[in-house]
Amino acid sequence: MTKKRLKVGIIAAEHSSDRLGAKIIESLKDIFEVDLYGLGGPEVNASPITTPNGIDYHDLHVMGLIDPLIKLPKIFLNRRKLLKLFISSDIDIFIGVDSPDFNIFFHKKLKLNNVKTIQVVSPSVWGWRENRIKTIEAYIDLTMCLFKFECDFYSKKNMQSFFLGHPFSQ
Protein backbone atom coordinates (compact mmCIF):
# COMPACT_ATOMS: atom_id res chain seq x y z
CA MET A 1 0.00 0.00 0.00
CA THR A 2 1.31 3.44 -0.94
CA LYS A 3 1.74 5.88 1.92
CA LYS A 4 0.33 9.38 1.64
CA ARG A 5 2.98 12.11 1.37
CA LEU A 6 3.10 14.61 4.24
CA LYS A 7 5.16 17.80 4.20
CA VAL A 8 6.20 18.53 7.77
CA GLY A 9 7.74 21.72 9.10
CA ILE A 10 9.52 21.19 12.40
CA ILE A 11 11.56 23.23 14.83
CA ALA A 12 13.33 21.34 17.59
CA ALA A 13 15.96 23.82 18.73
CA GLU A 14 17.06 22.34 22.05
CA HIS A 15 18.73 19.06 22.98
CA SER A 16 15.64 17.65 24.71
CA SER A 17 13.35 18.83 21.91
CA ASP A 18 15.68 17.27 19.34
CA ARG A 19 15.13 13.87 20.93
CA LEU A 20 11.33 14.33 21.12
CA GLY A 21 11.20 15.65 17.56
CA ALA A 22 13.13 12.64 16.25
CA LYS A 23 10.71 10.24 17.94
CA ILE A 24 7.71 12.04 16.46
CA ILE A 25 9.29 11.99 13.01
CA GLU A 26 9.91 8.24 13.28
CA SER A 27 6.27 7.69 14.27
CA LEU A 28 5.05 9.79 11.35
CA LYS A 29 7.24 7.78 8.96
CA ASP A 30 5.36 4.63 9.99
CA ILE A 31 2.20 6.16 8.52
CA PHE A 32 3.32 8.67 5.87
CA GLU A 33 5.99 9.40 3.30
CA VAL A 34 7.49 12.38 5.14
CA ASP A 35 9.25 15.38 3.61
CA LEU A 36 10.91 17.40 6.38
CA TYR A 37 11.62 21.12 6.46
CA GLY A 38 12.97 23.13 9.35
CA LEU A 39 15.58 22.88 12.04
CA GLY A 40 16.69 20.27 14.51
CA GLY A 41 19.74 18.85 16.15
CA PRO A 42 21.63 15.65 15.37
CA GLU A 43 18.69 13.33 16.12
CA VAL A 44 16.17 15.18 13.94
CA ASN A 45 18.85 15.53 11.27
CA ALA A 46 19.25 11.74 11.15
CA SER A 47 16.27 12.02 8.79
CA PRO A 48 16.72 14.00 5.57
CA ILE A 49 15.60 17.57 6.34
CA THR A 50 15.71 20.75 4.30
CA THR A 51 17.14 23.61 6.37
CA PRO A 52 17.81 27.13 5.07
CA ASN A 53 21.46 27.89 4.30
CA GLY A 54 23.38 29.53 7.09
CA ILE A 55 21.18 28.33 9.95
CA ASP A 56 22.70 26.19 12.64
CA TYR A 57 20.84 24.48 15.45
CA HIS A 58 23.18 26.11 17.97
CA ASP A 59 22.30 29.61 16.76
CA LEU A 60 19.05 29.42 18.70
CA HIS A 61 20.58 28.32 22.00
CA VAL A 62 20.49 31.27 24.38
CA MET A 63 20.95 31.53 28.13
CA GLY A 64 20.77 34.34 30.65
CA LEU A 65 20.15 38.01 29.88
CA ILE A 66 23.08 39.10 27.71
CA ASP A 67 23.28 36.10 25.35
CA PRO A 68 19.77 36.61 23.91
CA LEU A 69 20.48 40.30 23.29
CA ILE A 70 23.70 39.50 21.45
CA LYS A 71 22.07 36.79 19.33
CA LEU A 72 18.76 38.60 18.73
CA PRO A 73 19.54 39.92 15.21
CA LYS A 74 20.61 36.46 14.04
CA ILE A 75 17.59 34.84 15.71
CA PHE A 76 15.23 37.21 13.86
CA LEU A 77 17.04 36.55 10.56
CA ASN A 78 16.83 32.79 11.07
CA ARG A 79 13.17 33.06 11.99
CA ARG A 80 12.44 34.85 8.71
CA LYS A 81 14.43 32.25 6.73
CA LEU A 82 12.56 29.38 8.35
CA LEU A 83 9.15 30.97 7.77
CA LYS A 84 10.03 31.58 4.12
CA LEU A 85 11.06 27.92 3.78
CA PHE A 86 7.83 26.67 5.36
CA ILE A 87 5.61 28.84 3.18
CA SER A 88 7.50 28.21 -0.07
CA SER A 89 7.51 24.45 0.62
CA ASP A 90 3.74 24.48 1.16
CA ILE A 91 3.98 22.36 4.31
CA ASP A 92 0.90 20.47 5.50
CA ILE A 93 1.70 20.61 9.20
CA PHE A 94 4.00 22.51 11.54
CA ILE A 95 5.38 20.89 14.68
CA GLY A 96 7.00 23.17 17.23
CA VAL A 97 8.86 21.15 19.83
CA ASP A 98 9.28 22.94 23.17
CA SER A 99 10.60 26.55 22.90
CA PRO A 100 7.02 27.90 22.93
CA ASP A 101 8.06 31.56 23.01
CA PHE A 102 10.07 31.04 19.80
CA ASN A 103 7.62 28.68 18.09
CA ILE A 104 4.45 30.71 18.67
CA PHE A 105 5.61 33.08 15.91
CA PHE A 106 5.46 30.17 13.46
CA HIS A 107 2.15 28.90 14.80
CA LYS A 108 0.60 32.35 14.23
CA LYS A 109 2.02 32.92 10.75
CA LEU A 110 1.42 29.40 9.46
CA LYS A 111 -2.10 29.15 10.85
CA LEU A 112 -2.93 32.20 8.71
CA ASN A 113 -1.73 30.09 5.74
CA ASN A 114 -4.08 27.21 6.69
CA VAL A 115 -1.29 24.99 7.99
CA LYS A 116 -2.21 22.57 10.79
CA THR A 117 -0.15 23.31 13.91
CA ILE A 118 1.06 21.16 16.79
CA GLN A 119 2.99 22.25 19.86
CA VAL A 120 4.91 19.45 21.53
CA VAL A 121 5.58 20.24 25.21
CA SER A 122 2.85 22.48 26.54
CA PRO A 123 3.69 26.03 27.52
CA SER A 124 3.27 26.16 31.30
CA VAL A 125 0.11 28.26 31.11
CA TRP A 126 -1.27 26.33 34.08
CA GLY A 127 1.55 27.78 36.23
CA TRP A 128 2.17 31.28 34.94
CA ARG A 129 1.29 33.62 32.06
CA GLU A 130 -2.14 31.99 31.78
CA ASN A 131 -3.16 34.77 29.38
CA ARG A 132 -1.23 32.84 26.68
CA ILE A 133 -4.10 30.36 26.59
CA LYS A 134 -5.97 32.65 24.17
CA THR A 135 -3.03 32.60 21.76
CA ILE A 136 -2.70 28.83 22.04
CA GLU A 137 -6.42 28.40 21.42
CA ALA A 138 -6.30 30.66 18.35
CA TYR A 139 -3.16 29.32 16.67
CA ILE A 140 -2.38 25.79 17.87
CA ASP A 141 -4.55 22.89 16.69
CA LEU A 142 -3.11 20.29 19.07
CA THR A 143 -0.92 20.50 22.15
CA MET A 144 1.05 17.39 23.06
CA CYS A 145 1.56 17.35 26.83
CA LEU A 146 4.24 15.75 28.96
CA PHE A 147 2.01 15.62 32.03
CA LYS A 148 -1.55 14.34 32.40
CA PHE A 149 -2.67 17.38 34.41
CA GLU A 150 -1.78 19.58 31.42
CA CYS A 151 -4.24 17.66 29.25
CA ASP A 152 -6.85 18.03 31.98
CA PHE A 153 -6.21 21.80 31.97
CA TYR A 154 -6.73 22.01 28.19
CA SER A 155 -9.78 19.75 28.36
CA LYS A 156 -11.46 22.17 30.79
CA LYS A 157 -10.89 24.89 28.18
CA ASN A 158 -12.36 22.63 25.42
CA MET A 159 -9.02 22.57 23.62
CA GLN A 160 -7.39 19.65 21.78
CA SER A 161 -4.51 18.01 23.62
CA PHE A 162 -2.78 14.66 23.69
CA PHE A 163 -0.92 13.08 26.60
CA LEU A 164 2.50 12.20 25.26
CA GLY A 165 4.17 11.45 28.57
CA HIS A 166 7.50 12.63 29.89
CA PRO A 167 10.59 11.04 28.29
CA PHE A 168 12.09 10.31 31.73
CA SER A 169 9.09 8.17 32.62
CA GLN A 170 9.48 5.90 29.59
Where are these regions (language model features)?
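Active-site and donor-binding regions of nucleotide-sugar-utilizing enzymes
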Residues: 6-170
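Short, flexible hinge/linker loops that cap or flank conserved catalytic cores
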Residues: 2-3
